[in-house]
Regions:
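Short, amphipathic alpha-helical interaction segments positioned at domain boundaries
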Residues: 219-233
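Short amphipathic alpha-helical interaction segments
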Residues: 195-205
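C-terminal scaffold of the Radical SAM
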Residues: 1-196
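Minor-groove-contacting beta-hairpin "wing" of winged helix-turn-helix DNA-binding domains
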Residues: 213-217
C-alpha cells in the first residue's frame, strides 16, 4: 500500500482480488496482470512477495515493466524518487525466475504467458503489423507509415463532430528504418531472428544461438536499450 501511495495509485490488493474473481465468475478464460517494479521504498522482498501473490491468482499472462519517469510528471520533479538501474535489474530477474517456475514462458522482454495465451494485440506491434487506433492520442500504422491522433478528448471530439481530420502528425519510415526496427522488435521476442540476420559477435553476451535462431540472453533482455544502440548503423 505504501508503494501504491507513493505512485499516486488509489487501488489496493483487495481491489485486485475482487477484479480477478469477477473475471473468473464471468467465464473469461484469459487473465492478464500488469505489474510495475522499481518504485523507491519497494524492497526486493516486497517485490518478490508481490510476484508470488500474483502467481497465486493463476493468471494466464503477466506484463511486468520497470518504472519509467516521464518528463512533465510530478515524479520527474523529484530525482530522489527515480528508479535505480541495478535495483530494477535485480527485480527483473526475480519476476523472470518466479514466473518461469510457475509455467509462464517469457515470450517478449516484459511479457510472460501460459503457452497459447500470448497477447495477440502486442504481437501485432512486435511483428510490424498494421493497426488503426481510435480515440485521442491513439496511434496507427499501415504500410510503413505511423500516425497519431490529437491528444485531448476535447480536440478529438471537436474534430469528429466537424468531420475534420483527427490526425495530429505522422511519419513515413524509409526502408532502412523499417529493417532496423524489424530487427529490434523481433529480437525482443523469444522467437528472435534467423541466424544470419546479424553477427552475434556484435552483441557478445547479449544474444545466443538456439537452433536456427538468434535470441536474447537474460542479460540481453536486461540491457534491451544497449542492444538497440549496437544495432544502429
Amino acid at each position: 500500500m505504501q508503494v501504491h501511495a507513493s505512485l499516486g495509485r488509489t487501488h489496493n490488493p483487495a481491489n485486485v482480488q475482487r477484479a480477478v474473481e469477477s473475471v473468473r465468475s464471468s467465464g473469461i478464460p484469459a487473465l492478464n496482470l500488469d505489474l510495475i517494479y522499481g518504485a523507491v521504498g519497494e524492497t526486493l522482498d516486497d517485490w518478490r512477495y508481490t510476484v508470488q501473490q500474483a502467481v497465486e491468482l493463476s493468471p494466464t499472462h503477466v506484463s511486468a515493466y520497470g518504472l519509467t519517469v516521464e518528463p512533465g510528471t510530478p515524479l520527474a520533479l523529484e530525482p530522489h524518487r527515480h528508479p535505480d538501474d541495478d535495483d530494477q535489474a535485480d527485480k527483473y530477474i526475480i519476476v523472470d525466475d518466479i514466473l518461469r517456475s510457475a509455467g509462464l514462458a517469457n515470450y517478449e522482454i516484459s511479457n510472460w504467458a501460459i503457452p497459447g495465451f500470448e497477447c495477440r494485440h502486442n504481437l501485432l506491434y512486435w511483428r510490424q503489423g498494421d493497426y488503426t487506433g481510435f480515440g485521442c492520442a491513439a496511434h496507427s500504422h499501415a504500410d510503413g507509415r505511423r500516425w497519431w491522433n490529437v491528444r485531448t478528448p476535447e480536440r478529438y471530439i471537436e474534430a469528429v463532430d466537424t468531420n475534420s481530420p483527427t490526425e495530429a502528425s505522422g511519419e513515413t519510415l524509409d526502408v532502412a528504418t523499417r529493417k532496423r526496427e524489424a530487427l529490434e522488435l523481433s529480437l525482443r521476442t523469444s522467437d528472435g531472428v534467423p541466424v544470419g540476420a546479424l553477427d552475434p559477435k556484435t552483441l557478445d553476451g547479449l544474444v545466443e544461438v538456439v537452433g536456427e535462431r538468434i535470441v536474447l540472453t537474460q542479460r540481453g533482455r536486461l540491457l534491451g536499450n544497449e542492444v538497440s544502440l549496437r544495432l544502429l548503423p
